[in-house]
Every structure is written in C-alpha cells, then in structure tokens.
Amino acid sequence: MNTQSSVTESVVRNHLQAFLEQKGVAAIVDDYDETARFHSEARTYHGKQEIGGFFVDFIGSLPAGAIERFALRTLRVDGSIAYITWSVGSEIPLGTDTFVIGNGKIVSQTFAMYAAPVQ
C-alpha cells in the first residue's frame, strides 16, 4: 500500500471510529476539510457546518441500537479515494460511501443507503 493509500485508510477509519464510538458530531466532522462537499440523494452539503447538520439528522433518524449493529462490509482504498459498504441489520441492508481525501482530510464524500420499508 502506498503512502497516500495509507493516509486515506487512516482518515476513513478515524471517521468511522468517531461515529461508532458515539464521540459526537464535532468529532465526526473534525475529519472534514473546511470546504468539504458531502453529496447525498437529497442535496449537496457545503462545509463542516452543513455536513454536521446532516449527521445530526442522520444519527437522529437511525433505528434504536443501529450504531451497535453497524457492520463494515467493504473498505477499498486506491490512492486518495476510499469506498465502503456497510449495513445495519435488516433495517438498512446496504449503505455505501465514497471518500476523497486531500491533505489528511475528507474533501468530498458521497453517501447512499437503502432502508427497508417499515412493515
């Protein structure tokens, strides 16, 4: 693994750790560059403040116990790009994110997930 790939993997793992250890939104967005972009189906978030707002809403919308059931299925790194797939039990059988890392920070991220319909 080259140096850039190592940095990329480290940044993404730190980001996931902040989320999974429930360190709070401030710790989660600390991994982002000030001018980062976060792309979701609903909209593009610009900068740490808007990205933080996304995470407040996202964490609040998760099913009870979701963070404890989070499973990282795939982590692939190629230079400054990282791709992950993940799941949260049967409620969210597939989530995916792609990260672009620059100067040790997330500069761009895509996010998508499929949540099973509530029965």
Q: What residue ranges belong to the model's regions?
A:
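Short, low-complexity N-terminal intrinsically disordered segments enriched in polar/charged residues
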Residues: M1-D30
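A solvent-exposed, acidic/Ser-Thr-rich amphipathic alpha-helical stretch
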Residues: V25-V77
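Short, solvent-exposed coil/turn segments at beta-strand boundaries
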Residues: I28, V77-I81, F99-V107
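Short hydrophobic/aromatic-rich beta-strand segments that constitute the beta-sheet cores
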Residues: F38, I84, S108-Q109
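Short, cysteine-centered beta-strand-loop-beta hairpins and adjacent loop/turn segments enriched
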Residues: P63, G89-P93, P117
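Short beta-strand segments that buttress and anchor functional surface loops
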Residues: A82-S90
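Short beta-strand edge/turn micro-motifs at domain boundaries
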Residues: L94-Q119
